[in-house]
Amino acid sequence: IMLGDSLLSQKEDSITADNYNTLEVPLKCDFRFTMSDGTKVWINAGSTLKYPAKFAADSRTVYASGEIYLEVAKDAERPFYVVVDGITVKVLGTSFNIRAYADENETKVTLLEGKIAAQINDKEYTLTPGKQLKCDKTFGGPSVRTVDPAEIVSWTRGYYIFKKARLQEVANTLKNWYGVNIVLSSGASDIIYTGVVNKEEKLEVFLRRLEEVSNVKCNCNGKFVTIY
């Protein structure tokens, strides 16, 4: 499937006895569609979703990596499961966001509406709207905190909202959307940034704005960006 200048890859896989489709969204774009049960899915740049063409009679299970946002169709007889990076999220009908990129140190599950239960090893974490489960892959264990859901899912609406975010977190988000490699100096990575990035604007526009509001310099050379 062609999406702009990028190739959206879809293929069949075999995770269980059922055949699964694998939808791979490349960098510099996102994708949305509705699954066979009516669940709406938004898939961010550099992300993958594995899902069956038709769900089983007793449950609905998908596998994800990267970042996805789901509005799960209600079905009391068939709970919906999302398996991602060692976490299994169970819902009946709700809206939530998952961020689990392989090259990032944290996996985040954020609930917007409804109620979900996230299973990590032998422990279950129940989330209510506005709560985020954060699992650090390197240091410490899972933790739950209060967040602004509008900020978390702003990427589905054509822009990114950053509120007091570390510049390293900003870079992690923008590198996937713009398809570039962003390297920050040790001093720049911990700078706190607040602002809105329109996904339609060029990367150079953001870099110029960043230089104006922060004490940093930016050097862009093709697909390589250095911030120091």
What is each stretch, according to the model?
Residues 1-228:
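A residue-level detector for the "anchor" residue at the start of short, highly conserved motifs
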